[in-house]
Amino acid sequence: MPSLPVLIDTTTEFDVSSPQNVTQKRSLLLAPPSIAAHEEKLRDIFTTFDRSVTDLQMLDRLSAGFVTLPASTYDLVLVLTDTNGARRNEALELLTRDIFNILTPSMKPSAQLQLQDGPFQANEGREAILAGLVEKHGAFEKPQYQEAAVPLRFGANKRKNKISPEPVKIESVGFVDNYDDDELINEDDLLDEEDLGKPVQQPAECQPETAKKRRRACKDCTCGLAAQLEAEDAERREKANADLNVLKLKTDELNDEVDFTVQGKTGSCNSCSLGDAFRCASCPFIGLPAFKPGEEVRIMNDMAQL
């Protein structure tokens, strides 16, 4: 019996490979209000971007809160400023902090914010930086934050067997009771009539050496020294007042004439005629002008008569 040829089909009947899910990147176009009057520019833009994955929003409506953006949706945010930068200033003025507060949550991690006519200048990205975006190659990118769990160990190194120290013994001190019921003894009750009749003996410390310093009585002196010193001071004051009265001139003595031309009839200081600067404290010419020696001076009714 002749052999028949065998044909083997090597083509696969089915594909077991898993289908690849390709997610297209979404873009957001932000246009200033003036571009609405130029439909041809919008048509030119949509020739570059796919309408199915591209959204167009007006900056003024977004700033007024008329439009809400979905969270974590866009991979690219492009601000339409024309290729020649004709609407750059208008668009940058509308990119306020309120716009970034709405725009930043709608961007995916690693999404970029770009201008149509070129990179951002150094002074044009302050609000973007404050919103949390990072400058990268003339554009701003939303950083990709990674969450990680960090274990916290509180006091792990302190969990060791520690030997408790022995309690410190406090040395006891004498117990003092200030509120005892003991009655105070009157010192006068300990003296009899014979003790009360004895003279008071002055302590030795109340008799200091008078040659070196004046005696001084104690504040609560009971030996009689304070009374003795007070009596001596009163006697000294009386003597000083008496000596002062001797120097005072009476009314009839003020009318006496002092003649400096007669020998022996000068003042005690011999300076009565020189003026108050040279007169003694008890001079009757105090307050009068200076006069020449030998000039007759009379004091009549407290007035100098030259």
Swiss-Prot record:
Q: Does the keyword Secreted apply?
A: no
One Gene Ontology MF term: 4 iron, 4 sulfur cluster binding
* Entry cofactors: [2Fe-2S] cluster; [4Fe-4S] cluster
Return any one Pfam family short name. Answer: DRE2_N
Where, by residue number, is the motif Cx2C motif 1? Answer: 269-272
Q: Which GO terms describe its cellular component?
A: cytosolic [4Fe-4S] assembly targeting complex; mitochondrial intermembrane space
Keywords assigned by UniProt, alphabetized: 2Fe-2S, 4Fe-4S, Cytoplasm, Iron, Iron-sulfur, Metal-binding, Mitochondrion
This protein is called Fe-S cluster assembly protein dre2
Q: Which organism is it from?
A: Talaromyces stipitatus (strain ATCC 10500 / CBS 375.48 / QM 6759 / NRRL 1006) (Penicillium stipitatum)
